[in-house]
Amino acid sequence: MGFAKKEHEFLSAIGLAPENPGGFINGKWKASGPVISTVSPSNNQEIAKVTEVSMEEYEEGLRSCNDAAKTWKSLPAPKRGEIVRQIGDALREKLQHLGKLVSLEMGKILAEGIGEVQEVIYMCDFAVGLSRQLNGSIIPSERPDHMMFEVWNPLGIVGVITAFNFPCAVLGWNACIALVCGNCVVWKGAPTTPLVTIAVTKLIAEVLEKNNLPAAIFTAFCGGAEIGEAIAKDTRIPLVSFTGSSKVGAKVQQIVTERFGKCLLELSGNNALIVMDDADVGLAVRSIFFAAVGTAGQRCTTCRRLYLHESIYQNVLDKLVGLYNQVKIGDPLEEGTLVGPVHTKASRENFEKGISTIKSQGGKILTGGSVIESDGNFVQPTIVEIASNASVVKEELFGPVLYVMKFKTLEEAIALNNSVPQGLSSSIFTSKPNTIFKWIGPHGSDCGIVNVNIPTNGAEIGGAFGGEKATGGGREAGSDSWKQYMRRSTCTINYGTELPLAQGINFG
């Protein structure tokens, strides 16, 4: 068991125990559902046990959260921002421990685990400033002695369903904004990263208690698909944010839309990186390496398709294969490791199935392509030479597999970038301004993230994060994403004594 190991003593410092109730409901930790073991992907050994919530406990949590919403929405936005600031400070105090937990339970390397928690802290900082800027527009009225303007008000409760690959960052993108906008939050974390869900919730709960606020402002559930389905169906939750596959996201959207709720979807990515003949090859190769190999290929923004101009194709490919052949794969908590395991045994099996499909469609494995025999879920980062019209290229294989293809012209490369159902992230490497502006313009990439001379992954929190097409169309984190977490009213006030009608209508 994880708690028996000296190197796992830090777990106690963030409120975890060998056995943990997985529901934070009206200020109490409770759960009476199935007991699961959460394991380390590095060796598949148990870290701790977690009891998932029952449907009765879900209902109790929603009732208390709904009651707490009345208090929270009445608090001025800057006061709500102060609470989020304190949450950020609480996370800062436990940054190293939480980052280590993310690495242990999810499998990403320690630097990325710490970076993920840091991203939540940055979101808290962003949200604090935002709490004083939830401004509506003043609109000129065509009628004399009339004033027209917009007012933004809280929705009430925001449901956040997160995925295993970013077990706390995606919560931060949503919850920090939702809270300052005056909403309570109901969080269902991924079933395979429950300890991250519990540890982060404990810190938030301490801040609420210290400020004498209702604990149910933030409600958390560890559970399976039935809890996610309940959130999607619940009319008390006006907005549901879901991160996961396009297949499941389509089902969530259908359920939420049928009850006229709002959906914020962050779904599959099948991200392309284009290297033009005028690109800085060294910069491109380093970027491709991080984009394709980082987090063992399990980021939504991982580079999965690489399009190389035919004149530099072999040069870039040789350099890239050289990097792949010397990458350190191993325990994500060990210094120097760049590639940890994929998250579960099922992920490893999907990798194997994916390689078989690739070979059946004429793909040539240039490096990697095998699982690594061990107690953990380790696979080899893989580069595949394949035809751009192979059907497997249109799909998202969630692992460190990179498809490499040639192109001749910019127009061809853009068409290839846009040829898949997904539309999350994209990047081009070039030194020509006219290429850059075509790429980011109306005839360029159709993705939500359109980069130049940087990887497809590693987005900053200041910009809105999200994609188009089968990626779902949602936007989280920065820019004006906050507007999705509030309801907008257009208000017109007549402060005169006459009743002029719009459009000059004379009615009697």
From Swiss-Prot:
Q: Which reaction does it catalyse?
A: an aldehyde + NAD(+) + H2O = a carboxylate + NADH + 2 H(+)
Q: Where is this site: Transition state stabilizer?
A: 165
Question: Which residues take part in binding NAD(+)?
Answer: 244-249
Enzyme class, top EC level, equals oxidoreductase
Matching Gene3D superfamilies: Aldehyde Dehydrogenase, Chain A, domain 1, Aldehyde Dehydrogenase, Chain A, domain 2
Q: List the EC numbers from the record.
A: 1.2.1.3
Keyword Cell membrane appears in the UniProt entry: no
InterPro entries named in the record: Ald_DH/histidinol_DH, Ald_DH_C, Ald_DH_CS_GLU, Ald_DH_N, Aldehyde_DH_dom, ALDH7A1-like
Briefly describe its induction.
By osmotic pressure changes.
Family, as annotated: Belongs to the aldehyde dehydrogenase family.
Subunit comment: Homotetramer.
Q: What does the function comment of this entry state?
A: May play a role in fruit development.
Q: What is this protein's record name? A: Aldehyde dehydrogenase family 7 member A1
